């Protein structure tokens, strides 16, 4: 029996980075959701087989083609250390909850079969936004897809990698070491620049 090719749907798609990565890994992109015209034109040209659904706020996961993997890299503006740090519940970054809603709707429609995996990408500042409570809310939201709750208290600091193991699911995270080092690299560069003036 041949292995079934994995399928992918990308929310907050940008220019199709998850789809391109998926193709390189043998995963077939099926749909995307994006509102910015230029990135949509890029993916329409590079990935004409991918169906574009537009604004994530107007989507219902039950109406989307069921996929094995849903990816989301929603706007990081409100949790980024480069931004105002308004947090996960702010207007742009709060779109994260649309990702979880769509996953739940698709799982309900498919009797829990799809999606099998969810991939969330964001900035390193998501760990520290709102003193770490925003990342806890992300984990709680993903656990809620399976109807579970996190009982552990929020740690003083989120580690760069970790996991939550449920009876029939798991959640894992890993922060890019490059992303962690970036603020330190910038600080040192600014110090060098200040000394040279």
Language-model regions, residue ranges each:
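Conserved active-site and SAM-binding loop architecture
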Residues: 1-197
């Amino acid at each position: 029996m041949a292995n079934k090719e994995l399928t992918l749907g990308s929310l907050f798609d940008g220019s199709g980075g998850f789809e391109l990565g998926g193709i390189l890994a043998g995963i077939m992109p099926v749909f995307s959701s994006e509102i910015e015209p230029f990135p949509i034109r890029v993916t329409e040209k590079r990935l004409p087989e991918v169906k574009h659904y537009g604004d994530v706020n107007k989507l219902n996961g039950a109406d989307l083609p069921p996929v094995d993997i849903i990816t989301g890299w929603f706007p990081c503006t409100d949790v980024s250390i480069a931004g105002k740090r308004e947090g996960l519940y702010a207007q742009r970054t709060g779109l994260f909850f649309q990702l979880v809603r769509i996953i739940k709707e698709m799982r309900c429609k498919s009797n829990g079969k799809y999606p099998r995996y969810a991939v969330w990408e964001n900035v390193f500042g998501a760990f520290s936004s709102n003193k770490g409570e925003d990342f806890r809310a992300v984990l709680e939201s993903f656990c809620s897809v399976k109807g579970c709750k996190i009982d552990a208290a929020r740690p003083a600091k989120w580690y760069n990698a970790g996991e939550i193991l449920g009876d029939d699911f798991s959640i894992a995270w890993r922060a890019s070491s490059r992303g962690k080092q970036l603020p330190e690299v910038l600080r040192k560069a600014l110090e060098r620049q200040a000394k040279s003036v």
